[in-house]
Design a protein with these regions (language model features):
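A short, small-residue-rich loop immediately preceding and capping a beta-strand
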Residues: 87-125
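Solvent-exposed alpha-helices and their adjacent loops that cap or buttress functional pockets
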Residues: 9-11, 34-35, 87-90, 111, ...
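ATP/NTP phosphate-donor binding region
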Residues: 1-94
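A glycine/threonine-rich phosphate-anchoring loop and its flanking beta-alpha core
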Residues: 15, 112-208
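Active-site segments that bind and position negatively charged phosphate/pyrophosphate groups
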Residues: 199-300, 304-307, 311
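C-terminal charged capping/lid subdomain of soluble metabolic enzymes
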Residues: 2-4, 176, 287-355
């Protein structure tokens, strides 16, 4: 006779996601619908303030909300601490992150550590952190991924998103397409290490990747509908992590390679770009159709080669052979020992990434 079932887990999901043309003024209604009162802290940068921040601030001020603002730099533990200090001094009851990955991650982690709600207002789609429960923060010079909470709400204005350089939107596409290898790694860890696996989270993650792959040829620069087609899968990808209770649905060996490159060749390429190229190679290791990913990335304008990434062959070989050490607890196709330099070089040649 089987034992009594006692498994339980809480899932945090965004309460409201609003995306589309000209939705920024809906921030006041969103905050009101959430029942948020008191003072809000807006985290932005000088560029993102002009893109969307001023509209957010004016709309909330006109609606009677008291606001404090913090013009933050890069996402570091220091800027997160400063955001917390400002929020505590102002007795802020909610935070709003306006920007790309860094400003959203600063506000996200600060809100998590203060146990207050957070609203995400993206100004570009460079990666899938818009709605995820993870924050990527530089800690003592090293890039780390921190547990956080999903945003209470997401407000994504496509009229703003399409103004970002196309490189950022293409990088967001690459980050989501890389979910294909993340899921393969997760399934492998489930089979070999008995790691918990969520079919629903995996399905959402794969669905978001497929949405980009199947629409790649229709995604065009300066076409607002393209921002609409990109931001939806990016948000779904983030939500899949919330359902899984971990970043597993969207972070596998390709992300380990990206994090290794952050240390070996910092600032050379965007996170999503590195993940996209990593996914080409990892799909080949899995024995899958890596050329399908390659075609998609090429079509949307994301890098597919070392030259396009600005990474040398030696740097990528180093990343491939050391990536397994980035998160020893995260089992992937790279295994416990990693791959040999000769195998890494062969992989680069076989996939055409070395071109």
């Amino acid at each position: 006779m089987h034992g009594e079932f006692r498994k339980s887990r809480a899932m945090q999901l965004p309460r409201q996601i609003t995306a589309g043309h000209g939705v920024l003024p809906q921030i006041a209604a969103m905050v009101r619908d959430f029942g948020l009162k008191g003072t809000g802290l807006i985290v932005w940068g000088p560029h993102t303030r002009a893109l969307a921040g001023d509209t957010i601030a004016k709309t909330l001020s006109d609606a009677g909300y008291d606001l404090q603002t913090y013009e933050a730099g890069e996402a570091t533990t220091e800027t997160v601490s400063r955001a917390k200090e400002i929020a505590q001094e102002a007795k802020a009851s909610f935070l709003i992150g306006v920007g790309g990955g860094t400003k959203i991650d600063i506000a996200k982690l600060a809100a998590h550590e203060l146990s207050v709600p957070f609203i995400s207002v993206p100004t570009n789609c460079a990666h899938d952190g818009i709605a995820s429960p993870r924050a990527t923060i530089k800690d003592d010079g090293r890039i780390r991924s921190f547990d956080a909470d999903v945003p209470l709400g997401v407000l994504a204005d496509t009229a703003v998103l399409i103004k970002a350089p196309w490189r950022f939107l293409a990088a967001g596409c690459a980050d989501v397409v890389a979910n294909k290898t993340a899921i393969l790694d997760w399934r492998l860890a489930h089979r070999l290490r008995n790691e918990e696996f969520s079919s629903s989270a995996a399905t959402m993650s794969e669905m978001s990747a497929e949405a980009i792959i199947q629409e790649a040829e229709f995604l065009k620069r300066n076409l607002e509908e393209s921002a609409w087609s990109i931001v939806r899968p990016i948000i779904v990808s983030g939500v899949s992590m919330a359902i899984a209770g971990s970043s597993r649905p969207a972070s596998g060996s390709e992300h380990l390679i990206s994090h290794a490159l952050d240390q070996i060749a910092p600032g050379k390429a965007l996170h999503g770009e590195q993940c996209g190229v990593g996914s080409i190679m990892m799909m080949a290791l899995h024995g899958g159709d890596f050329k399908r990913l390659q075609r998609c990335l090429h079509t949307v304008g994301a890098p597919t080669t070392l030259r396009q990434l600005g990474i040398s062959k030696e740097q990528m070989v180093q990343a491939l052979t050391t990536a397994h050490k980035v998160r020893p607890d995260r089992y992937t196709i790279l295994g416990d020992q990693g791959i040999m330099p000769e195998a890494a070089e062969r992989l680069l040649e076989t996939t055409g990434v070395a071109a």
